[in-house]
Amino acid sequence: MSPQTETKTGFGFKAGVKDYRLNYYTPEYDTKDTDILAAFRMTPQPGVPPEEAGAAVAAESSTGTWTTVWTDGLTSLDRYKGRCYDIEPVAGEENQYIAYVAYPLDLFEEGSVTNMFTSIVGNVFGFKALRALRLEDLRIPPAYSKTFQGPPHGIQAERDKLNKYGRPLLGCTIKPKLGLSAKNYGRAVYECLRGGLDFTKDDENVNSQPFMRWRDRFLFVAEALFKSQAETGEVKGHYLNATAGTCEEMMKRAIFARELGAPIVMHDYLTGGFTANTSLAHYCRDNGLLLHIHRAMHAVIDRQRNHGMHFRVLAKALRMSGGDHVHAGTVVGKLEGEREVTLGFVDSLRDDYIEKDRSRGIYFTQDWVSMPGVFPVASGGIHVWHMPALTEIFGDDSVLQFGGGTLGHPWGNAPGAVANRVASEACVQARNEGRDLAREGNEIIREASKWSPELAAACEVWKEIKFEFETIDTL
């Protein structure tokens, strides 16, 4: 920034432009337990010192603006300003730094992810003094997290509702994602559920299009749910996508799902927005509905490692806003996700207390206190050969979702569901017997396929399918 230039008036107010670091770079600051802490990866413009860039981030995302204003004298900036309290260079990267910023809790409205993000990831991301800026992590203090309801029900309450324990839950996204009539859509749902899956799912862009209006879809899916439940004796669910063009329409769809007796609805939380998502989560808790969350649009925000926001931040925000499931990548499938980084934010979704661990991208210790956990959903390009790795990576408290890996079975949807259920139970049994899923996974699947012709057929179809590309977003 420009050097300090000031004009003193007769009232003691000094007008002009000051370096941000004079007020907002405070390396001597001791963070408070009530502060929201942020870790930004910043790339300053040539000639901008990192201290000035870090201070600019703190200022522009809290109380500061580009020039001194006389109304600063009407409040206590020391109480309300953000502070850049530490800066460290990023190893192996030229002119990149991690800037740590502390925000006083009074800057944020209680229970509002929308307000929190409007400040922390608002206009500052277009600031000219920075070539790029990325929010890597947030520490949400209990004093703030306790103002949020969080997930409508959480992991344990969902297991109790479903009466399903000791294994990952299995799901399937109905394909083709667009173009089916409501009746044929319901037929596909029924076949998958009677074959052994716990859930089926609307794709994220299935809302209410001319080929299949939402009310028709809900009715045929409800029929499929009740029929499959009667035949299998298991609780079944289908993620009925309530996402709509207005909050009022979204709520109308959720209310209709509840009236039909559906156990779960779905929302696209990034395209739908955090305000809509929090409203829906509150309704779901009050009315006994589970809430599945899809993260459509996340890669627009989180995929570039130098600019935007890491998904671990979006995951924490979702836990606060509310959702019982959220898509979290697969590590082994077709979508982006490095193993240790993925497990870092999976822990942030499920666990009560997460220790700082930079090797997994966790910049701050996070204490969620009593906020319920969220099921991570692994979905995208996975099939039966991935089952051992998925079981080993994600454990029991997860939802493994096979779309093409169910509906692409050569014998149809129900045999595809059977193949996935057999593979999952074989992996869980082998793990419980002490076998090493990472080393013996293929052997475990081959053994199970000897007594399951459906699994054997699936193994043959997908034996050569791999998605081996280098991960873009790495530590």
Swiss-Prot record:
Residues that coordinate or bind Mg(2+): K201, D203, E204
PROSITE patterns with a match to the protein in the record: RUBISCO_LARGE
Keyword tags: Acetylation, Calvin cycle, Carbon dioxide fixation, Chloroplast, Disulfide bond, Lyase, Magnesium, Metal-binding, Methylation, Monooxygenase, Oxidoreductase, Photorespiration, Photosynthesis, Plastid
Documented EC number(s): 4.1.1.39
GO cellular component: chloroplast
Modified residues (N6,N6,N6-trimethyllysine): K14
Residues carrying the site annotation Transition state stabilizer: K334
Listed GO biological process terms: photorespiration; reductive pentose-phosphate cycle
Post-translational modification comment from the UniProt entry: The disulfide bond which can form in the large chain dimeric partners within the hexadecamer appears to be associated with oxidative stress and protein turnover.
Pro-piece positions: 1-2
Comment on bound cofactor: Binds 1 Mg(2+) ion per subunit.
Keyword Cell division attached: no
Modification type N-acetylproline: residues: P3
CDD domains referenced in this protein's UniProt entry, alphabetically: RuBisCO_large_I (cd08212)
Cell compartments where the protein resides: Plastid, Chloroplast
Enzyme class: lyase
Function: RuBisCO catalyzes two reactions: the carboxylation of D-ribulose 1,5-bisphosphate, the primary event in carbon dioxide fixation, as well as the oxidative fragmentation of the pentose substrate in the photorespiration process. Both reactions occur simultaneously and in competition at the same active site.
UniProt miscellaneous comment: The basic functional RuBisCO is composed of a large chain homodimer in a 'head-to-tail' conformation. In form I RuBisCO this homodimer is arranged in a barrel-like tetramer with the small subunits forming a tetrameric 'cap' on each end of the 'barrel'.
NCBIfam families: PRK04208.1
Subunit-structure text: Heterohexadecamer of 8 large chains and 8 small chains; disulfide-linked. The disulfide link is formed within the large subunit homodimers.
Protein name listed in UniProt: Ribulose bisphosphate carboxylase large chain
Organism: Angiopteris evecta
Lineage: Eukaryota, Viridiplantae, Streptophyta, Embryophyta, Tracheophyta
